[in-house]
Amino acid sequence: MKPTAEILASIIEEVRPLTGQGKVADYIPALAKVPSEKLGIAVFTNQGEVISAGDAQEGFSIQSISKVLSLTLAMGLYQPNELWSRVGKEPSGQAFNSLIQLEMEHGIPRNPFINAGAIVVCDMLQSRLSAPRQRLLEFVRQLSGEPLIAYDKVVAASEMMHSDRNAAIAYLMRSFGNFHNEVIPVLHNYFHACALKMSCVELAKTFSYLANKGVSVVTGETVITPTQSKQTNALLATCGLYDGAGEFAYRVGMPGKSGVGGGIIAVVPGEMTIAVWSPALDQSGNSLAGTRALELLAQRIGRSIF
Protein backbone atom coordinates (compact mmCIF):
# COMPACT_ATOMS: atom_id res chain seq x y z
CA MET A 1 0.00 0.00 0.00
CA LYS A 2 1.13 3.55 -0.72
CA PRO A 3 1.16 6.22 1.99
CA THR A 4 -1.83 8.58 1.84
CA ALA A 5 -2.84 11.73 3.69
CA GLU A 6 -5.57 9.69 5.40
CA ILE A 7 -3.09 7.09 6.68
CA LEU A 8 -0.76 9.80 8.00
CA ALA A 9 -3.61 11.69 9.69
CA SER A 10 -4.85 8.51 11.39
CA ILE A 11 -1.33 7.73 12.64
CA ILE A 12 -0.99 11.25 14.07
CA GLU A 13 -4.22 10.84 16.02
CA GLU A 14 -3.25 7.38 17.25
CA VAL A 15 0.16 8.38 18.59
CA ARG A 16 -0.82 11.81 19.93
CA PRO A 17 -1.32 10.49 23.51
CA LEU A 18 2.37 9.49 23.54
CA THR A 19 3.45 13.15 23.29
CA GLY A 20 2.63 13.44 27.00
CA GLN A 21 5.17 10.74 27.80
CA GLY A 22 8.94 10.93 27.43
CA LYS A 23 10.99 14.02 28.15
CA VAL A 24 11.97 17.04 26.07
CA ALA A 25 15.76 17.54 25.90
CA ASP A 26 16.57 19.95 28.71
CA TYR A 27 20.38 20.04 28.75
CA ILE A 28 20.17 22.57 25.91
CA PRO A 29 18.02 25.39 27.38
CA ALA A 30 16.67 26.54 24.00
CA LEU A 31 15.32 23.03 23.31
CA ALA A 32 13.72 22.72 26.73
CA LYS A 33 11.23 25.46 25.76
CA VAL A 34 9.72 23.52 22.81
CA PRO A 35 6.12 22.36 23.55
CA SER A 36 6.08 18.57 23.94
CA GLU A 37 2.68 18.20 22.23
CA LYS A 38 4.08 19.08 18.79
CA LEU A 39 3.72 16.19 16.32
CA GLY A 40 4.28 16.03 12.57
CA ILE A 41 4.99 13.56 9.78
CA ALA A 42 5.90 13.98 6.11
CA VAL A 43 6.61 11.58 3.25
CA PHE A 44 8.47 12.57 0.08
CA THR A 45 8.24 9.97 -2.69
CA ASN A 46 10.75 9.33 -5.45
CA GLN A 47 8.10 10.69 -7.83
CA GLY A 48 8.33 14.06 -6.04
CA GLU A 49 5.02 13.86 -4.17
CA VAL A 50 4.73 15.35 -0.66
CA ILE A 51 2.24 13.81 1.78
CA SER A 52 2.04 15.18 5.32
CA ALA A 53 -0.01 15.49 8.50
CA GLY A 54 0.15 17.32 11.83
CA ASP A 55 2.87 19.92 12.42
CA ALA A 56 4.83 18.87 9.34
CA GLN A 57 5.44 22.43 8.11
CA GLU A 58 6.80 23.77 11.40
CA GLY A 59 10.55 24.25 11.75
CA PHE A 60 12.51 22.68 14.60
CA SER A 61 16.12 22.08 15.58
CA ILE A 62 17.32 19.04 13.61
CA GLN A 63 20.28 18.38 15.94
CA SER A 64 22.00 15.05 15.16
CA ILE A 65 20.13 14.53 11.90
CA SER A 66 22.67 17.06 10.55
CA LYS A 67 25.41 14.46 11.11
CA VAL A 68 24.22 12.68 7.96
CA LEU A 69 24.63 15.88 5.94
CA SER A 70 28.14 16.48 7.28
CA LEU A 71 29.11 12.90 6.42
CA THR A 72 27.68 13.29 2.91
CA LEU A 73 29.78 16.43 2.37
CA ALA A 74 32.89 14.67 3.69
CA MET A 75 32.32 11.73 1.33
CA GLY A 76 32.72 14.14 -1.57
CA LEU A 77 35.95 15.63 -0.19
CA TYR A 78 37.87 12.58 1.02
CA GLN A 79 38.88 9.19 -0.34
CA PRO A 80 37.21 6.31 1.55
CA ASN A 81 40.48 5.18 3.16
CA GLU A 82 41.12 8.73 4.45
CA LEU A 83 37.62 9.10 5.87
CA TRP A 84 37.29 5.69 7.50
CA SER A 85 40.76 5.72 9.04
CA ARG A 86 39.54 8.49 11.35
CA VAL A 87 36.06 7.25 12.23
CA GLY A 88 34.62 3.73 12.44
CA LYS A 89 31.49 2.04 11.11
CA GLU A 90 30.35 0.11 14.18
CA PRO A 91 27.44 0.70 16.59
CA SER A 92 28.67 2.05 19.92
CA GLY A 93 26.18 0.66 22.42
CA GLN A 94 27.14 3.63 24.61
CA ALA A 95 25.55 7.02 25.21
CA PHE A 96 26.00 9.36 22.23
CA ASN A 97 28.38 11.62 24.17
CA SER A 98 30.47 8.92 25.87
CA LEU A 99 34.12 9.65 26.67
CA ILE A 100 34.95 6.22 28.08
CA GLN A 101 34.76 4.31 24.79
CA LEU A 102 36.74 7.02 23.02
CA GLU A 103 39.56 6.71 25.55
CA MET A 104 39.57 2.91 25.33
CA GLU A 105 39.69 3.01 21.53
CA HIS A 106 42.52 5.56 21.24
CA GLY A 107 40.55 8.53 19.96
CA ILE A 108 38.85 6.81 17.00
CA PRO A 109 35.05 7.24 17.33
CA ARG A 110 32.91 4.18 16.71
CA ASN A 111 30.80 5.78 13.96
CA PRO A 112 30.00 9.18 12.37
CA PHE A 113 26.58 9.47 14.03
CA ILE A 114 27.66 9.79 17.67
CA ASN A 115 29.00 13.13 18.89
CA ALA A 116 32.68 12.17 18.71
CA GLY A 117 32.32 10.85 15.16
CA ALA A 118 30.44 13.90 13.95
CA ILE A 119 32.97 16.23 15.55
CA VAL A 120 35.79 14.42 13.71
CA VAL A 121 33.84 14.78 10.45
CA CYS A 122 33.46 18.53 11.15
CA ASP A 123 37.21 18.70 11.77
CA MET A 124 37.73 17.07 8.35
CA LEU A 125 35.38 19.58 6.69
CA GLN A 126 37.31 22.42 8.35
CA SER A 127 40.52 21.10 6.76
CA ARG A 128 39.11 21.07 3.21
CA LEU A 129 36.56 23.92 3.10
CA SER A 130 37.28 27.64 3.50
CA ALA A 131 33.79 28.29 4.93
CA PRO A 132 32.26 24.97 6.08
CA ARG A 133 29.31 26.59 7.85
CA GLN A 134 28.24 28.47 4.72
CA ARG A 135 28.87 25.41 2.52
CA LEU A 136 26.61 23.23 4.67
CA LEU A 137 23.83 25.82 4.59
CA GLU A 138 24.05 26.13 0.80
CA PHE A 139 24.04 22.33 0.53
CA VAL A 140 20.85 21.97 2.61
CA ARG A 141 19.08 24.78 0.77
CA GLN A 142 19.95 23.15 -2.54
CA LEU A 143 18.88 19.62 -1.52
CA SER A 144 15.58 20.78 -0.02
CA GLY A 145 14.75 23.36 -2.68
CA GLU A 146 14.10 25.77 0.21
CA PRO A 147 16.31 28.89 0.01
CA LEU A 148 15.17 30.29 3.37
CA ILE A 149 16.44 27.49 5.62
CA ALA A 150 18.72 28.99 8.27
CA TYR A 151 20.64 28.27 11.44
CA ASP A 152 18.86 29.00 14.72
CA LYS A 153 21.46 31.29 16.28
CA VAL A 154 19.83 31.10 19.73
CA VAL A 155 20.11 27.29 19.78
CA ALA A 156 23.70 27.40 18.48
CA ALA A 157 24.71 29.91 21.17
CA SER A 158 22.90 27.89 23.84
CA GLU A 159 24.82 24.75 22.84
CA MET A 160 28.14 26.59 22.79
CA MET A 161 27.53 27.78 26.35
CA HIS A 162 26.98 24.16 27.43
CA SER A 163 29.75 22.62 25.35
CA ASP A 164 32.13 21.31 28.02
CA ARG A 165 31.56 17.65 27.27
CA ASN A 166 31.84 18.02 23.50
CA ALA A 167 34.99 20.11 23.96
CA ALA A 168 36.39 17.34 26.17
CA ILE A 169 35.64 14.84 23.39
CA ALA A 170 37.47 17.01 20.84
CA TYR A 171 40.52 17.58 23.06
CA LEU A 172 40.69 13.88 23.90
CA MET A 173 40.74 13.02 20.19
CA ARG A 174 43.38 15.68 19.62
CA SER A 175 45.56 14.07 22.30
CA PHE A 176 45.42 10.87 20.21
CA GLY A 177 46.27 12.77 17.00
CA ASN A 178 42.78 12.43 15.51
CA PHE A 179 41.89 16.13 15.46
CA HIS A 180 43.79 18.54 13.22
CA ASN A 181 42.27 22.02 13.67
CA GLU A 182 41.59 24.40 16.54
CA VAL A 183 38.84 22.93 18.70
CA ILE A 184 36.65 26.01 19.27
CA PRO A 185 36.04 26.95 15.58
CA VAL A 186 35.19 23.32 14.77
CA LEU A 187 32.75 23.17 17.70
CA HIS A 188 31.11 26.39 16.47
CA ASN A 189 30.54 24.72 13.09
CA TYR A 190 29.31 21.52 14.73
CA PHE A 191 26.78 23.36 16.90
CA HIS A 192 25.54 25.43 13.97
CA ALA A 193 24.93 22.24 12.00
CA CYS A 194 22.91 20.87 14.93
CA ALA A 195 21.00 24.17 15.08
CA LEU A 196 19.70 23.97 11.51
CA LYS A 197 15.99 24.75 11.71
CA MET A 198 13.90 22.65 9.34
CA SER A 199 10.43 21.14 9.05
CA CYS A 200 9.44 17.51 8.43
CA VAL A 201 8.61 18.37 4.81
CA GLU A 202 11.99 20.05 4.28
CA LEU A 203 13.85 17.13 5.87
CA ALA A 204 12.03 14.50 3.81
CA LYS A 205 12.90 16.40 0.63
CA THR A 206 16.51 17.00 1.69
CA PHE A 207 17.28 13.31 2.18
CA SER A 208 15.59 12.11 -1.01
CA TYR A 209 19.02 11.20 -2.42
CA LEU A 210 19.28 8.34 0.08
CA ALA A 211 16.10 6.77 -1.33
CA ASN A 212 17.19 7.35 -4.94
CA LYS A 213 20.69 5.82 -5.25
CA GLY A 214 22.45 9.08 -4.43
CA VAL A 215 20.48 11.32 -6.80
CA SER A 216 18.37 14.15 -5.34
CA VAL A 217 14.72 13.89 -6.39
CA VAL A 218 14.45 17.65 -5.85
CA THR A 219 17.33 18.77 -8.08
CA GLY A 220 17.96 15.71 -10.25
CA GLU A 221 21.66 16.04 -9.44
CA THR A 222 23.99 13.33 -8.15
CA VAL A 223 24.83 14.00 -4.49
CA ILE A 224 26.82 10.82 -3.78
CA THR A 225 27.44 7.62 -5.75
CA PRO A 226 24.97 4.70 -5.59
CA THR A 227 27.57 2.76 -3.57
CA GLN A 228 27.99 5.64 -1.09
CA SER A 229 24.21 5.91 -0.76
CA LYS A 230 23.96 2.19 0.01
CA GLN A 231 26.81 2.45 2.53
CA THR A 232 25.21 5.47 4.24
CA ASN A 233 21.90 3.63 4.57
CA ALA A 234 23.74 0.64 6.06
CA LEU A 235 25.31 2.92 8.68
CA LEU A 236 21.93 4.53 9.39
CA ALA A 237 20.36 1.10 9.92
CA THR A 238 23.05 0.04 12.40
CA CYS A 239 24.14 3.31 14.05
CA GLY A 240 21.51 5.97 13.34
CA LEU A 241 19.58 5.89 16.60
CA TYR A 242 22.29 5.95 19.25
CA ASP A 243 22.01 2.95 21.59
CA GLY A 244 18.40 2.45 20.46
CA ALA A 245 19.39 1.36 16.93
CA GLY A 246 18.52 -2.30 17.47
CA GLU A 247 15.11 -1.48 18.91
CA PHE A 248 14.40 0.85 15.97
CA ALA A 249 15.48 -1.77 13.41
CA TYR A 250 13.24 -4.31 15.15
CA ARG A 251 10.19 -2.04 15.31
CA VAL A 252 10.51 0.13 12.20
CA GLY A 253 12.87 -1.77 9.90
CA MET A 254 14.22 1.22 7.97
CA PRO A 255 17.53 3.11 7.92
CA GLY A 256 17.02 6.16 10.14
CA LYS A 257 18.62 9.06 11.98
CA SER A 258 17.30 10.81 15.04
CA GLY A 259 18.08 14.05 16.83
CA VAL A 260 17.40 15.26 20.37
CA GLY A 261 15.18 17.99 18.89
CA GLY A 262 12.66 15.16 18.42
CA GLY A 263 13.11 14.65 14.69
CA ILE A 264 13.73 11.33 12.93
CA ILE A 265 14.33 10.72 9.23
CA ALA A 266 13.77 7.27 7.74
CA VAL A 267 14.50 5.90 4.28
CA VAL A 268 12.70 3.34 2.12
CA PRO A 269 15.34 2.81 -0.60
CA GLY A 270 13.91 3.05 -4.09
CA GLU A 271 10.64 4.56 -2.88
CA MET A 272 10.49 7.39 -0.35
CA THR A 273 11.95 9.40 2.52
CA ILE A 274 10.00 10.01 5.72
CA ALA A 275 10.46 12.60 8.46
CA VAL A 276 8.68 12.74 11.82
CA TRP A 277 8.86 15.19 14.70
CA SER A 278 7.76 14.97 18.31
CA PRO A 279 10.02 16.61 20.93
CA ALA A 280 9.48 14.24 23.89
CA LEU A 281 12.29 11.66 23.94
CA ASP A 282 12.77 8.13 25.23
CA GLN A 283 15.74 7.06 27.38
CA SER A 284 18.00 6.69 24.33
CA GLY A 285 17.30 10.27 23.20
CA ASN A 286 14.98 9.28 20.36
CA SER A 287 11.50 10.70 19.76
CA LEU A 288 8.98 8.52 21.59
CA ALA A 289 5.88 9.35 19.54
CA GLY A 290 7.98 9.73 16.38
CA THR A 291 9.31 6.18 16.64
CA ARG A 292 5.80 4.83 17.18
CA ALA A 293 4.51 6.83 14.19
CA LEU A 294 7.19 5.32 11.96
CA GLU A 295 6.44 1.84 13.32
CA LEU A 296 2.74 2.24 12.48
CA LEU A 297 3.51 3.66 9.03
CA ALA A 298 5.86 0.76 8.25
CA GLN A 299 3.11 -1.69 9.25
CA ARG A 300 0.34 0.04 7.32
CA ILE A 301 2.21 0.45 4.06
CA GLY A 302 4.03 -2.87 4.45
CA ARG A 303 7.58 -1.57 4.11
CA SER A 304 10.82 -2.80 5.68
CA ILE A 305 14.35 -3.32 4.40
CA PHE A 306 14.41 -6.71 6.12
From Swiss-Prot:
EC numbers for this chain: 3.5.1.2
Top-level taxon in the UniProt lineage: Bacteria
Coiled coil: none
Enzyme class: hydrolase
Keyword DNA repair tagged: no
InterPro entries assigned to the protein according to its UniProt record, in alphabetical order: Beta-lactam/transpept-like, Glutaminase
Signal peptide positions on this chain: none
Catalysed reactions, semicolon-separated: L-glutamine + H2O = L-glutamate + NH4(+)
Hydrolase listed as a keyword: yes
Residues reported to bind substrate: 64, 115, 159, 166, 190, 242, 260
GO biological process: glutamate biosynthetic process; glutamine catabolic process
Keywords: Hydrolase
Cystine residue pairs: none
A GO molecular-function descriptor: glutaminase activity
Family classification: Belongs to the glutaminase family.
UniProt subunit comment: Homotetramer.
The protein's name: Glutaminase
Organism this protein belongs to: Vibrio cholerae serotype O1 (strain ATCC 39541 / Classical Ogawa 395 / O395)
Name of the encoding gene: glsA
